[in-house]
Amino acid sequence: MEYRFLKSEVRENGIVVLTLANPASLNALNSATLQEINHFVMNLPESASLLIITGEGKAFVAGADISEMADFNAQQGLDFGRFGSEVFRRIEDLNIPVIAAINGFALGGGCELAMACDIRIASAKARFGQPEVKLGIIPGFSGTYRLSKLVGQGYAKEMMYSGRMIDAAEALRVGLVNHVVEPEELMPYVNSLAEDIVANAPVAVRYAKECINRNYDMSETDGIELESQLFSKCFDTEDQKHGMKAFMEKTKPEFKNR
């Protein structure tokens, strides 16, 4: 598939960079862009070890495309919301880590896209918000669910009821992002973090992600049992044998993803 609104890079170590590249619209999410993201995520190379998502220009994603939504009826709104949520859930469920490198505005669907990623690193110039109520709607791509999980119901309600934007420092304070860096340091910081992650045992990283993600919907007892089961499965991997041997021999491990 030839992409109109996306650019991508695949590095030798398996790190994949996906850039939303429609800066004239501030990378707004329309149906075509969502289709492209969906196709890209479903067709990641088998060698992919980590995905970085960022935006071109002054926005990460400044929201959904209002010009497309303006004449929706209820059924069209349902279809659009469900598809966006499906795409973002597919990103969340990838068996590799996903980092959002938030270079600018992350509003509405852009904030929702960032929240579907495992880790969020923000430029000091980034701005966040769920301003949908100013347009007569509510978040439609699972924002009410994920924002409440990340920052708590009280703060999520304040953001959604008021429609106000918050800056990167406030996003860091409330737990919406992991780190804030100067704009020129955003990609170097994200690249360094990505390289640290992919240097670790891929199966172990995958199991850690599975535990954390699935714990959302589990009781404490079931979540702890899942951890025990996946912890035990690590001992059937070559990477565990090699990693512990390298530790005891004070050498650097080279993991094989098996």
Locate the predicted segments by residue.
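Well-ordered beta-strand positions
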Residues: I119, E158, S162-R164, E170, ...
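Terminal low-complexity tails and localization/encapsulation signals of metabolic enzymes
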Residues: M1-R4, K245-R258
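Conserved CoA-thioester-binding segment of acyl-CoA-metabolizing enzymes
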Residues: M1-E56, R89, M187
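Glycine- (often His-adjacent) and acidic-residue-rich active-site loop
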Residues: N38, E46-S47, G55-R90, A106, ...
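CoA-thioester-processing core
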Residues: V87, I91-N95, A101, L107-Y161, ...
